[in-house]
Regions:
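Interface amphipathic segments
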Residues: 1-219
Length: 219
């Protein structure tokens, strides 16, 4: 069989009737999906897709205020073959950093080996600021550089996740957080957490470890 789907500047407002009354969605999506298959030869089809969204905006009401999320860029790509599957994505929120990544699954019907990378660049809590009242603040920078390996049954992750210069003073948290640092390091099937959360009453020192020999240990 063969299937081809092409989107030419699809206006996402057509989905508005299916959303809750407090939700709003706008923007345009374009892209293409192609697939062909022969189940007598292989149960895994051949497929390719690429979708781009421009000016994607979503908002909902939270505690009486409107929380908007606007993406300057959103791109999703993928390829599926009997021998491998590849996913890719780029997400760029308005007014802050972005997220890029890719993931490959080799031998998806057998060993399902993984390899990939996710990079988060200079993300700030800009999305929280519409929820803040006058005098409240939320600052900090979130970054990550992670690589994946192993298999779906025994995943492995390497790299670092950091939160730097975190300051939070808002009604939805029980204390005021002064400049604080948190770091998470992944080393295959284990990770370490370090950091210091500073408050007016004192500091909270973070020090922890975790491991996951198999995927079942994630649950």
């Amino acid at each position: 069989g063969v299937l081809k789907v092409r989107l030419e500047e699809l206006n996402l407002e057509v989905l508005q009737p299916y959303l809750k009354r407090r939700e709003r969605l706008s923007g345009h999506v374009k892209g293409e999906f192609k697939a062909d298959w022969d189940i007598d030869k292989n149960v895994i089809p051949n497929a390719d897709w690429a979708f781009d969204a421009d000016g994607l905006a979503y908002s909902t009401r939270v505690d009486g205020g409107r929380l908007p999320v606007t993406l300057e860029a959103l791109r999703l790509t993928g390829t599926v073959r009997p021998e491998h599957a590849v996913l890719g994505w780029t997400v760029k929120p308005e007014g802050t950093g972005g997220v890029e990544g890719n993931l490959t699954i080799e031998d998806p019907a057998g060993e399902r080996r993984m390899k990939g990378r996710v990079v988060v660049s200079d993300m700030t809590p800009v999305l929280l600021k519409p929820l803040l009242s006058k005098g409240e603040r939320a600052e900090g920078v979130f970054a990550a550089d992670l690589t994946a390996g192993g298999t779906l049954e025994a995943p492995r992750i390497w790299g670092d996740v950091t939160l730097k210069g975190v300051e939070l003073d808002a009604g939805f948290v029980p204390f005021e957080m002064n400049p604080s640092e948190i770091a998470l390091r992944f080393e295959g099937d284990r990770s370490t957490l370090t950091g210091r959360i500073s408050t007016a009453e004192g500091d909270l020192v973070l020090d922890g470890r975790a491991s996951w020999p198999t995927a079942e240990d994630w649950t």
